[in-house]
Amino acid sequence: MIKLIVGLGNPGAEYTATRHNAGFWLVDQLAREAGTTLRDERRFHGFYAKARLHGEEVHLLEPQTYMNRSGQSVVALAQFFKILPDEILVAHDELDMPPGSVKLKLGGGSGGHNGLKDITAHLSSQQYWRLRIGIGHPRDLIPESARAGARPDVANYVLKPPRREEQDVIDASIERALAVMPQVIKGELERAMMQLHRNP
């Protein structure tokens, strides 16, 4: 059963629409669905709400520590409410998946994502669930003939808003993720994965 859903992103209006904030977009939608508002909760270093979703009580969290210190926020809440790593779902942007794709997985490495890296370090565990929201990689924007030796600027890419057509398919992927939240929250994660991964 999932008791805590974390959205990763950077605080501040200048980052709201950037690719790196895709995790925030999902949690914002969940808060709207639950008819609740995320509020600044200093003891958890983030915006927090306790929500009733699909008949269950769920904690929603958006760390306000900047991405590379997200673990500080997650562990503060998890320890306070005695939530185990495998009861946590972290929604985050995923460079290695194209815009419009979304996948669930348990555990694994950070894939170079600093937010995941810090959460793993603070929880002393990789065994938490991830909802990977595809944002694409800047190398995909380089013509194939020019890719050899090219060094795309990943940091700049994730801190820019998606193009309009990318935003549309990212929004659609978040809608697909929201559609499986009843199973996710109830702990039927294998079923949720089958349903989500059936729709690329």
Swiss-Prot record:
SUPFAM superfamilies: Peptidyl-tRNA hydrolase-like. It is an enzyme of class 3 (hydrolase). Its main location: cytoplasm. GO terms for biological process: protein quality control for misfolded or incompletely synthesized proteins; rescue of stalled ribosome. Pfam families: Pept_tRNA_hydro. GO terms for molecular function: peptidyl-tRNA hydrolase activity; tRNA binding. It comes from the Bacteria. This is Peptidyl-tRNA hydrolase.
